[in-house]
Amino acid sequence: SWDNLGTMLCCHRDYQLGDCNSNRETELQLAEICRKYGKSDEEIDEMTFSEEIQFILDQDDVCGLPLWIYDHSGISMSTRRQCSWDSSFVGLIFVEKDFYLAQMCLKDEKDWKAKAKETLEGEVKTYSDFLEGNVYQWTLYEPIIEIRQSMDGKELSRKIDEEGEIVDSMCGFYSLTFEDADAYFDFEIAEIEQID
């Protein structure tokens, strides 16, 4: 399963982004949150998308960040505008204070917003890696070796299929550096060798 602390509410005419399955679902979620923090249905009906976002971001019990996409031969997401031409404001990522403190097992409320902001920025970075295709997997193969022998046991030929049987695999690695990958693969190979 995939667990994030933040909720992403986004609207875009071309892309389905964030935690909602449609722009309409995002609009309903935004209205519900505005209602929770004191806005009437009439006030919500008069608010623009940006005004609803700003209202939520201004709440003391909410830590949130605006979300922007950069759309040029693919898309990426950030909490800051990347470019005046190809960037679009698409929504927000937020977490409410009570939920954050409970999930992080924190009793001390001091600096909760700064800590939550750091967490949310990391979640946006990971989501952007997903949008950009910076997600990796590894597969460990055990080669299959075919040896043909004569009747007296002499080797006649040897055929090695490097991509033989799959021994193990794992996916869901984001923004790996080669050093990260090497360290992880070395650990996994050592574990498998111990089992054998």
What name fits each language-model region?
Residues 1-196:
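Acidic interaction surfaces
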